[in-house]
Amino acid sequence: MTPEEVLEEFRSAGALLQGHFILSSGLRSPTFLQKMTIFSDPARTERLCRALAEVITARFGRIDIVVSPAIGGIIPGYETARHLGAKAIFVERDPGGPFTLRRGFSIPAGTRAVIVEDIVTTGLSARECLASLKDEAGEVVGAACLIDRSGGRGAIGLPLLSLVTLDIPTYAPDALPAELAAIPPVKPGSRALPKP
């Protein structure tokens, strides 16, 4: 699947949005990738994750376990693992705490794991996921995502593969360009949503 075909999947699903968005990192952006619109379509998700599995296999070879950060990474992690013939597990947060492996999940000695994310903006979730795996016996060989919107700057401490790398600008809330500041912001993501 070419980068343009990946972007067309997002465009045709109405998942490539323009406006003024508050990202889960707190940064602001004129572009938002609404991945849950993608993941609500099993056929579209299957196509994208099959392509991601092919990229992972070409770079890393055998993968035994796919680890994803909850919640956003669970669907692409599971579907990518299915195409890799691997086990799918996830890390999750205790409220206000770091990611941890729970539910009896582990990465045993001799296994090769890859972290699978949905969209990488700063790399924070992938870095936190990797940190939560430091005491596991198996080897975490790299990470992969559908779209790296950091322009390749989302360093996580491992090789990061993506189907598409975009350089989508992000801004601190106090450093917005005038044209973005003129648009009322919306927070379409899920991290730290205000309580109703």
Swiss-Prot record:
Subunit comment: Homodimer.
Binding positions (5-phospho-alpha-D-ribose 1-diphosphate): 117-125
Pathway(s) of this molecule: Pyrimidine metabolism; UMP biosynthesis via de novo pathway; UMP from orotate: step 1/2
Catalytic reactions of this protein: orotidine 5'-phosphate + diphosphate = orotate + 5-phospho-alpha-D-ribose 1-diphosphate
CDD domains: PRTases_typeI (cd06223)
Single biological process term from Gene Ontology: 'de novo' UMP biosynthetic process
Function noted in UniProt: Catalyzes the transfer of a ribosyl phosphate group from 5-phosphoribose 1-diphosphate to orotate, leading to the formation of orotidine monophosphate (OMP).
Keyword DNA repair (UniProt): no
Positions that bind orotate: 121, 149
Source species: Methylorubrum extorquens (strain PA1) (Methylobacterium extorquens)
Protein name per the record: Orotate phosphoribosyltransferase
Enzyme class: transferase
GO molecular function, one term: orotate phosphoribosyltransferase activity
SUPFAM superfamilies the UniProt entry points to: PRTase-like
Family to which this protein belongs: Belongs to the purine/pyrimidine phosphoribosyltransferase family. PyrE subfamily.
Keyword Glycosyltransferase on entry: yes
Cofactor (UniProt): Mg(2+)
EC id: 2.4.2.10
